[in-house]
A protein has these predicted regions:
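Polar/acidic, low-complexity leader/linker segments enriched in S/T/G and N/D
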Residues: 1-6
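Glycine-centered secondary-structure boundary/capping sites
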Residues: 9, 16, 75, 134-137, ...
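Alpha-helical bundle regulatory/interaction domains
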Residues: 80-83, 87-161
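N-terminal functional module of multi-domain proteins
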Residues: 12-115
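Residues that form generic nucleotide/phosphate-binding pockets
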Residues: 7-10, 146
Length: 161
């Protein structure tokens, strides 16, 4: 099963094909959206998000050791992690979060969002790919400890808040 299916409860209306990359089109009472999913390598998927809706349901229990990297190109995304914990992404913002961090709600308040999501399943990335990433200075064990184990979300703003 593709990683995006474990994170998003999209109830797709139609799919362009079963081949990859794959585009999933969906809608609800607040609008419509689509995600184009592109597998990158074992344990990594890239999703192009084109949303014109207020909200959609997210899956209740995402997999552990999955990192969700988001970049907002246009629009705004907001989510709440429960009492006293929320975040938002505006145009140009970048976020790295543990996918296991349970969201109590999420929305696109402008009904307009374009961005990308990169999903990394740290348990599925091959030793060869890990060594290539380390060569570029990406330490997946350090990321796992900081993001997944500590259940953190790091946001880099394009402009000061």
């Amino acid at each position: 099963m593709a990683m995006y299916k474990s994170l998003f409860d999209l109830s797709p209306e139609q799919t362009a094909s079963t081949a990859m990359p794959r585009t999933v089109v969906f809608s609800n009472g607040t609008g419509s959206g689509s995600m184009t999913i592109c597998p990158l390598f074992s344990g990594a998927e890239l999703c192009y998000n084109d949303m014109h809706l207020v909200s959609f349901d997210e899956a209740p229990a995402p997999a552990r050791n999955v990192i969700e990297i988001n970049h907002c190109r246009v629009g705004r995304y907001e989510c709440s992690f429960g009492e006293n914990s929320c975040c938002y992404l505006a145009a140009g913002d970048f976020a790295v979060c543990a996918a296991a961090r349970k969201k109590s709600s999420s929305c696109f308040p402008l009904r307009h969002y374009h961005g990308i999501t990169i999903l990394l399943d740290l348990d599925a990335i091959s030793p060869e790919m890990r060594s290539r990433m380390e060569w570029y200075g990406v330490n997946l064990n350090a990321i796992r400890q900081y993001i997944c184990t500590e259940n953190r979300c790091c946001i880099l703003r394009s402009a000061p808040v």
